[in-house]
Amino acid sequence: MSAKDVKFGVDARDKMLRGVDILANAVKVTLGPKGRNVVLEKSFGAPRITKDGVTVAKEIELDDKFENMGAQMVREVASKSADAAGDGTTTATVLAQAIVKEGAKSVAAGMNPMDLKRGIDLAVEAVVADLSRNSKKVTSNEEIAQVGTISANGDSEIGKFLADAMKKVGNEGVITVEEAKSLETELDVVEGMQFDRGYISPYFVTNAEKMRVEMDDAYILINEKKLSSLNELLPLLEAVVQTGKPLVIVAEDVEGEALATLVVNRLRGGLKVAAVKAPGFGDRRKAMLQDIAILTGGQAISEDLGIKLENVTLQMLGRAKKVMIDKENTTIVNGAGKKADIEARVAQIKAQIEETTSDYDREKLQERLAKLAGGVAVIRVGGATEVEVKERKDRVDDAMHATRAAVEEGIVPGGGVALLRASEQLKRIKTQNDDQKTGVEIVRKALSAPARQIAINAGEDGSVIVGKILEKEQYSYGFDSQTGDYGNLISKGIIDPTKVVRTAIQNAASVASLLITTEAMVAELPKKNSPAPAMPGGGMGGMDF
């Protein structure tokens, strides 16, 4: 085990504070509509330009081990806020820096760190209660567009795209962001359920021009196993032919005699049929087939359930208004599943999302949820250069998470005003002793930091602006740093999702109070590089000449 370097008390906190300041100062220049860009060096390719707080925070590693520990703790604040609400990373970093700075002064003055922490916790509870009390529900498309615009640093085009996407796929629908190949940003919406499996044979194609299968009012057979022999399928095929409706077969695979017979029947025009492979693998495939069954009002045919293919009746098949299959994807639109069944399945998947610890599983579950709940929207972000596209994609990602958060918990005035107003409530908090009171006061002072920083980034005097905002009683009254005017921020469209502001203050206070109560720090000493061993002597030992 290598030797360690240990620092205590003021020494440790000073080093840690320096690290906190370096990271927070780099991140906070991006705050607000007039925030500046940060250029990040890449080991290969062009440098990356960003205004996204968490992206900047993730790039910072410091040489000094103790300073780096402080910086990494604050980086955790930004990451946690990004994970929970998808935005508010810079606000959280600014708050954490302000709380740590004031807290360290109080500890140095001899106050009890644990009482300070209790005071901070009391203050945060009061702030969260005040935010939820003043939160306004988001209902209209315009409000969603406003939230998206603010989070995308005032880019109204991004706000509009997000509002359109949410309108089309619903609040539960999946919105993915991709890089476009062109200059234009565009929105592409897939209605219904789509999975990434195409037709097994091109002979099933009905629309030769677009090379895809299009079937209206189709039956859907959902089978878990391979289909290779046709005998077990014959009774069902005859029943489908008599209805005159088309049939889509979703199975692990269709091969040999079964595939040949289906293709021949399709070409002769006796049976409108198409076959696709089942999506996913293993247990995930079973779950996805069950999703398709619930969406279409059918039953997944599985030997686990004791259902044999020869016993399948028309009632066990799913139905859909339209099925489209191309070379790579299958889309089922307007399945005939019962609304109550689909809602129950959605609730079940939501519960699994809450429980899972794996990010990959969560992503896959959210995809399944979206396919059941509404559909998938893809925003393709365009731009003139690769650097511009990447920077814009960052902002679209931020804005997408912010709009989701706004729909979930509502909105409050932006520009740091909601936290400023909450700071007024902290004057009424009753504490058990003076040190706890100081803890509350630390948070009260810190709550003005985001509004102050937004003003500073806009070239104004932060303290003057904070003073002017607090002079007015009106909750939504604040400073619009884009135009330099004061007024009602909600009616101006300057708004923040309540969830973003809430997670920012909770995460900032959580990490900051841990830093304040730190009394010792342990880091590895750098290894001394020993000189390389001398080269062995030349010649060929043991040889007689």
Curated annotation (Swiss-Prot):
SUPFAM superfamilies assigned to the protein according to its UniProt record, in alphabetical order: GroEL apical domain-like, GroEL equatorial domain-like, GroEL-intermediate domain like
Binding site residues for ATP: 30-33, 51, 87-91, 415, 496
GO cellular component terms attached to this protein's record: cytoplasm
List its EC numbers. Answer: 5.6.1.7
InterPro entries (alphabetical): Chaperonin_Cpn60_CS, Cpn60/GroEL, Cpn60/GroEL/TCP-1, GroEL-like_apical_dom_sf, GROEL-like_equatorial_sf, TCP-1-like_intermed_sf
Which reaction equations make up its catalytic activity? ATP + H2O + a folded polypeptide = ADP + phosphate + an unfolded polypeptide
GO-annotated molecular function: ATP binding; ATP-dependent protein folding chaperone; isomerase activity; unfolded protein binding
Pfam families this protein is in? Cpn60_TCP1
Q: What is its main location?
A: cytoplasm
Q: What class of enzyme is it?
A: isomerase
Alphabetically ordered keywords of this record:
ATP-binding, Chaperone, Cytoplasm, Isomerase, Nucleotide-binding
Q: Where in the cell is it found?
A: Cytoplasm
The organism's place on the tree of life at top rank: Bacteria
Name the job this protein performs: Together with its co-chaperonin GroES, plays an essential role in assisting protein folding. The GroEL-GroES system forms a nano-cage that allows encapsulation of the non-native substrate proteins and provides a physical environment optimized to promote and accelerate protein folding.
Q: Which family does it belong to?
A: Belongs to the chaperonin (HSP60) family.
Assembly and partners are described as: Forms a cylinder of 14 subunits composed of two heptameric rings stacked back-to-back. Interacts with the co-chaperonin GroES.
Identification of the protein by name: Chaperonin GroEL 2
State the organism of origin. Answer: Nitrobacter winogradskyi (strain ATCC 25391 / DSM 10237 / CIP 104748 / NCIMB 11846 / Nb-255)
Q: What is the lineage of its organism?
A: Bacteria, Pseudomonadati, Pseudomonadota, Alphaproteobacteria, Hyphomicrobiales
Q: Which gene encodes it?
A: groEL2
